[in-house]
């Protein structure tokens, strides 16, 4: 499985099906998290999902790319309450598992009135 395929499978199973039962297949125990609002480690990710899954998120992947051990994912994250977030996640893969994560999030883009005619996604 390529690194990109690993991340696609992770998004489908974990984020879109809200299922962390196979997390050991995707994530290293010492997963490094760079988002300041989420704890590091696999157990930290499990804690994060308790809140995040309560929002009933759905990710629609717009772009995904792979460069060596780095995979980036640009996606639309729609929450049950109607909020739409524009997100770019970046992962470092090590030994076939997610080892490190960075992200950039633009929250509530449904409320933004663009000053241009370009699409947001």
Enumerate the language-model features and the residues they cover.
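C-terminal and inter-domain tail/linker signature
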Residues: 1-121
């Amino acid at each position: 499985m390529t690194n990109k395929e690993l991340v696609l499978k992770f998004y489908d199973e974990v984020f879109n099906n809200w299922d962390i039962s196979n997390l050991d297949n995707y994530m290293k125990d010492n997963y490094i998290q760079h988002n300041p609002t989420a704890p590091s480690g696999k157990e930290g990710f499990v804690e994060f999902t308790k809140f995040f899954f309560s929002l009933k998120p759905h990710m629609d992947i717009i772009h995904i790319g792979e460069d060596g051990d780095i995979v980036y994912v640009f996606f639309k994250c729609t929450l049950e309450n109607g909020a739409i977030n524009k997100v770019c996640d970046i992962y470092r893969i090590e030994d076939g598992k997610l080892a490190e994560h960075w992200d950039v999030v633009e929250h509530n883009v449904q409320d933004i009135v663009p000053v241009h005619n370009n699409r947001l996604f």
